[in-house]
Amino acid sequence: MARYTGPITRKSRRLRVDLVGGDQAFERRPYPPGQHGRARIKESEYLLQLQEKQKARFTYGVMEKQFRLYYKEANNRPGKTGENLLRILESRLDNVVYRAGLARTRRQARQLVTHGHLLVNNKKVDIPSYRVSQYDIIDVKEKSLSTLPFQVARETVGDRPVPGWLQVVGSRLRILVHQLPERAQIDIALQEQLIVEYYSK
């Protein structure tokens, strides 16, 4: 299954959650798209679980196959499966770039990574799904600092709260990974237990 590259607002409306953050089109019409979008739908337990899984997938921009692999890994780790899953998703490099404020959306962050603008521990990494570890140092390549996205990032970094597990050195746009996040540090409206229930059937 190919990655969804269509209008994200349409997915936001279908799942009834702002997948982008600050999506004015969603705020104007926060109901499902289509002729019968405002009609009430009987929400079964399965539908709620499916919607929660889809919210997570589209929020982080992950395909179903990859998401299922993340779930299996989370399930095999000690601790709560749902929290493990969110920790895995949050530790993706594209998400870290977004969380640090170097990109306005996760889609833009993915693009910055794939275009080879970033170094992790002084090594070029252009894979959005690359997973950061505690004490990793993420830098913008020297020649990339003069490009428009990073000029904008320099001016706007700090406008959005940075989670406590990350630190951004504004002038250099350096990201320090102090730790991997705890559930309380993941500011996202997801009921991860519903995702666990979906895959447990």
UniProtKB/Swiss-Prot annotation:
One of its GO terms (cellular component) is small ribosomal subunit. Pfam families: Ribosomal_S4 (PF00163), S4 (PF01479). The keyword Chloroplast does not apply. Residues 91-157 form the S4 RNA-binding domain. The keyword Cell inner membrane does not apply. GO terms for molecular function: rRNA binding; structural constituent of ribosome. SUPFAM superfamilies: Alpha-L RNA-binding motif (SSF55174). Keywords: Ribonucleoprotein, Ribosomal protein, RNA-binding, rRNA-binding. GO terms for biological process: ribosomal small subunit biogenesis; translation. CDD domains: S4 (cd00165). Signal peptide: none annotated. Part of the 30S ribosomal subunit. Contacts protein S5. The interaction surface between S4 and S5 is involved in control of translational fidelity. Belongs to the universal ribosomal protein uS4 family. One of the primary rRNA binding proteins, it binds directly to 16S rRNA where it nucleates assembly of the body of the 30S subunit. With S5 and S12 plays an important role in translational accuracy. NCBIfam families: PRK05327.1, rpsD_bact. This is Small ribosomal subunit protein uS4. It comes from Rhodococcus erythropolis (strain PR4 / NBRC 100887).
